[in-house]
């Protein structure tokens, strides 16, 4: 009986070790894979190589639903989150502020400095019922044994997101209108990017702008290599965990984001999850009006 128990413990330990190691492993090849109408099995196989993957995903339901005109006509009064991306977040200051979709889009379009984006809009997706549309149309990209699903809609116009990486098992970004460019960098360059681990917002970002690098950051940024890819409507890209990326919005653009975690993925990143929970237990934030 004792022998069987020891064998069982060893088997469980080995199982966990192998799967956690798989989730922690990364690939650093400066290459992006392109697919042509992949099957679910083929897509899973390629994504497990931990390299960026690009293909065309002509999903008419998503293209018709996740665009400015339809969202404004149907859900213009609902609140969405706006973020000022070109400034350093001060202590106790909120990263996101709620605005109606109408006012939020007006802010990102008309502000002279083009420093706002709309993102982190899972609440908006839930309240408007768009969650059903996302869920009905992600069967190709949703992995097996999913434990957490994060849908988002990102809006931008002639600006870019911060340079950051995600820890999720799968991260997909589909362009539904406009044009964007994405700058990607493999995980091995992290030590040169002055990484900020923001556990309050569970965001892992760099103060370096890869599109317009300041002089004080050039010596470090020149040590890393980047890929740049352009997305047109219907294009979708998979960005592996721990790969750095920044999205540049060339014009008025809308991006549908799909992020997934599995149980083993959660176990592998549990130290970060625990730190995030502890960090948010006693946080007092200051609300600042960032849009004139």
Per-region residue spans from a language model:
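N-terminal accessory scaffold of Fe(II)-dependent oxygenases
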Residues: 1-236, 244-292
């Amino acid at each position: 009986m004792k022998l069987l128990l020891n064998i069982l413990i060893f088997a469980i330990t080995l199982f966990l070790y192998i799967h956690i190691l798989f989730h922690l492993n990364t690939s650093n090849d400066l290459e992006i894979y392109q697919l042509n109408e992949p099957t679910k099995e083929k897509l899973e196989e390629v994504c497990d190589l931990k390299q960026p993957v690009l293909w065309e995903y002509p999903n008419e339901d998503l293209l018709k639903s996740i665009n400015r005109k339809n969202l404004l006509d149907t859900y213009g009064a609902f609140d969405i989150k706006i973020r000022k991306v070109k400034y350093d977040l001060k202590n106790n200051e909120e990263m996101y502020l709620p605005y109606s979709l109408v006012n939020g889009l007006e802010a990102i379009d008309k502000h002279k400095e083009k420093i706002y984006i709309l993102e982190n809009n899972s609440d908006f997706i839930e309240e408007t019922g768009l969650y059903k549309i996302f869920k009905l149309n992600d069967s190709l990209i949703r992995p097996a044994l999913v434990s957490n699903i994060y849908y988002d809609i990102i809006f931008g116009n002639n600006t870019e997101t911060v340079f950051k990486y995600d820890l999720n098992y799968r991260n997909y970004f589909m362009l539904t209108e406009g044009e964007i460019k994405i700058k990607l960098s493999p995980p091995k360059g992290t030590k040169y990017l002055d990484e900020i681990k923001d556990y309050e917002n569970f965001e892992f970002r760099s103060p370096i702008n890869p599109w317009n690098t300041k002089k004080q950051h050039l010596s470090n940024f020149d040590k890393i290599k980047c890929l740049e890819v352009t997305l047109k409507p219907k294009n979708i890209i998979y960005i592996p965990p721990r790969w750095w990326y920044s999205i540049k919005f060339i014009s008025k653009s809308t991006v549908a984001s799909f992020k997934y975690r599995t149980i083993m993925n959660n176990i592998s990143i549990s130290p970060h999850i625990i730190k995030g929970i502890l960090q948010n237990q006693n946080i007092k934030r200051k609300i600042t009006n960032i849009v004139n």
